[in-house]
Amino acid sequence: MKILVTDDSKMARKMVIKTLNEDIEEDLEIFEAQNGQEALDLYKEILPTIVFLDLTMPIRDGFTALEKIKEFDKNAKVVVISADIQKLSMDRVLKLGAFDFVKKPIDSTKMKQILKKLN
């Protein structure tokens, strides 16, 4: 399974990757991006199974990256990760086509549930 983890914080990316590697008993190919533009470019190159995407990033924020990824591939599975998921943001990402969302700090049980929904 190819997974793209996008966050401007290297520590946040490492936490998501650590959670995935510890809790998922499947072969994972994990790629990293540090902003929304990198995520979009990398998505087009590797066509990951799922994308974990932070909302607040420089260059291209998560909202715009989500929108552009969905324009490129309407079937893309994008999971929004954010410390501050307000109702307004939640409504917006769901309208843009987010597959699911995870609140920071990362809950490994939630991550497992999301990956099970892919099958």
Predicted segment positions?
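Two-component/phosphorelay signaling modules centered on CheY-like receiver
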Residues: 10-31
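Helix N-cap/capping motif at the beta->alpha junctions
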Residues: 32-41, 62
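Active-site beta3 strand of CheY-like receiver
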Residues: 46-52
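Receiver (REC) domain active-site loop signature in two-component systems and cognate sites
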Residues: 57
